[in-house]
Amino acid sequence: MSEQYFAGHPKSRRRPAEIHVAVRGHSFTFRTDAGVFSREEIDRGTELLLAAFEVGPCELVLDLGCGYGALGIVAARLSEGGHVILTDVNERAVALARTNVAANEIANAEVRLGNLYEPVRDMAFDHIVCNPPIRAGRVVVDRIVTEAPMHLLDGGKLWLVARTRQGADSLRGRMTASFGSAEVVRRGSGYKVLRSTKAGV
């Protein structure tokens, strides 16, 4: 059985690769490796999420389970004056994300090692963006959803993407249970991008 990308300490033999991509008018280079998600190209779900994601200036963003950092790095480039924190439990992914933040000359982002929300336990954000690790199991995905409101400011948004055949509709139901509603903001190639908003007091 191949090593899962959500393992904390990848042991797989290194196979470095490099991805060059244009996203929303900006060019990016991402260094990747074995033992991280979507090593050879940005996966279609992440592409859809990047196309749908809306971030304004001076906003605080959490890229949860960042992998090699594509979502968070693009968000940082789009949010002038904002700040992005990228987190992952995978040590190799965190090292790659830090390399990619520097390589893309991103000054308004930082990468932290840790499981889910642990590295940001006392923080709240305008946006949480995540391509959830469905293969890690329902308990992990449920925590991403149910703990999100504690880490969002009033009016803050949780953005997730999932394959329809891997439970996107069920995921939308869990988001609705935690937030009161969840909308499909984009769909394509068998994926749905979902968004929930934390209501103000």
Where do the model's predicted regions map?
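N-terminal auxiliary segments of SAM/dcSAM-dependent transferases
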Residues: 1-24, 34-35, 39
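Class I S-adenosyl-L-methionine
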Residues: 3-15, 168-201
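General small-molecule cofactor/ligand-binding pocket signal
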Residues: 31, 110-112, 183-185
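Class I S-adenosylmethionine
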Residues: 31-53
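Conserved SAM/SAH cofactor-binding pocket of Class I
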Residues: 45-130, 136
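Short "lid" loop at the C-terminus of a central beta-strand within the Rossmann-like core
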Residues: 134-136, 163-168
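A short glycine-rich, Lys/Arg-flanked "PGG" loop and its adjoining helix->strand segment in the class I
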Residues: 142-154
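Conserved beta-strand signature within the Rossmann-like core of class I S-adenosyl-L-methionine
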Residues: 155-162
